[in-house]
């Protein structure tokens, strides 16, 4: 909870080498969801708004989320589960400067933490790992079976909001601009 009494999200985010999806499916207690996330036009209150469709072909959940940064790795997060009709209505407010992000999220319990690995449809090389924490001082336990490239918690180019502008990680943009396109 933030000082204002609003719900607070505290997390660390890492750029990782894209793991093998089949390997992730074999991890006990792992869960896979498909996610489509669309950013909406800004309002005056400074909150980033988005809608999300999450689930599998058998069951979908729709959410409307508002986030605002308040400190290192900390954001106010207001999230509501909404009916599909409201989701479709809010999609009409999509920010045309951003593309919808499609990803597979693999949630894995690991050493009393929940790992959230996002595998994006636009990248065959990279993925992200997010770990929500009770407070910013809580130590993070990173699994040895993931190739961690960098802590990108406060790096703008790695937020889902930024990724939705280019549908590429900063490293991929640099490779393309540099003519390497590896």
Model-found features: residue ranges?
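Phosphate-end processing signature that detects enzymes handling 5′-triphosphorylated RNA
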Residues: 1-182
């Amino acid at each position: 909870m933030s000082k204002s009494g609003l719900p607070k999200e505290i997390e660390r985010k890492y750029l990782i080498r894209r793991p093998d999806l089949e390997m992730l499916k074999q991890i006990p207690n792992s869960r896979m969801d498909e996610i489509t996330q669309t950013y909406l036009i800004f309002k005056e209150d400074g909150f980033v708004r988005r809608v999300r469709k999450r689930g599998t072909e058998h069951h979908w959940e729709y959410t409307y989320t508002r986030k605002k940064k308040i400190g290192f790795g900390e954001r106010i997060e207001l999230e509501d589960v909404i009916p599909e009709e409201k989701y479709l209505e809010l999609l009409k407010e999509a920010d045309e400067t951003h593309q919808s992000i499609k990803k597979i999220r693999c949630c894995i319990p690991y050493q009393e933490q929940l790992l959230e690995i996002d595998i994006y449809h636009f990248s065959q090389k990279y993925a992200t790992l997010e770990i929500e924490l009770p407070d910013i001082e809580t130590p993070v336990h990173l699994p040895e079976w993931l190739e961690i490239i960098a802590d990108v918690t406060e790096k703008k180019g790695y937020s889902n909001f930024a990724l939705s502008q280019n549908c590429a990680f900063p490293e991929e943009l640099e490779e393309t601009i540099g003519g390497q396109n590896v």
